Amino acid sequence: SITYFLNILYAAPDWEQVENKSVELLRQYLKVDTSNPPGDVRKGVSWLAKIFKEHGIKYETFKVPDDPRRMHILAEFPGTNPDLKPLLLLNHIDVVPADYDAWSTDPFQAEIIDGIIYGRGALDMKSLGIMQMMSLILLKEEGFKPERTIKFLGVADEEILGQYGVQWMIKNHWNKLDPEWVWDEGGL
């Protein structure tokens, strides 16, 4: 209804504050070395879990029994209609190892130079993970109740197309995913 849209317009978040918070979260996340190889994403999963917990968003972590360095995190923003399959926001936690000689900054310090954040994973793909996370945080803060559940899935092992990434989650935990749509770096 028009009242709903007017309420959103006049009660919209402080977008400058949202941008500042997003930048700070991205910088923190970029400082977590999740290079693959070796593929140890435990600190990345712990960091994501901490942020979800701080914002009261339900999440679950999954350890790969064959390789405990590989973990995944699934957060959920519940919808009002349990008959609808969820929208899955998919991203990966691991990054390609940094060639320090090719960097003019420390790739794990997330420096801002001339308005640009420099850090391993800034483009591929920790920035998308933060955008997806911030979407859930903002929806929760604004009191939005989606009809369809929205899930955030951060996975390991993408950079080497390993067997313990999203394929492992599909094989072992499809019942927790089962999405209608998946939104990742390639689109919807």
Predicted regions mapped to residue ranges:
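Compositionally biased amphipathic helical and low-complexity segments enriched in hydrophobic
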Residues: 7-10, 178
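Short linear interaction motif-like sites in intrinsically disordered regions of transcription factors
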Residues: 5, 16, 48, 104, ...
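Acidic/His- and Gly-rich active-site-bordering loop/insert found
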Residues: 12-120, 129, 139-148
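Bacterial N-terminal signal peptides
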Residues: 1-7
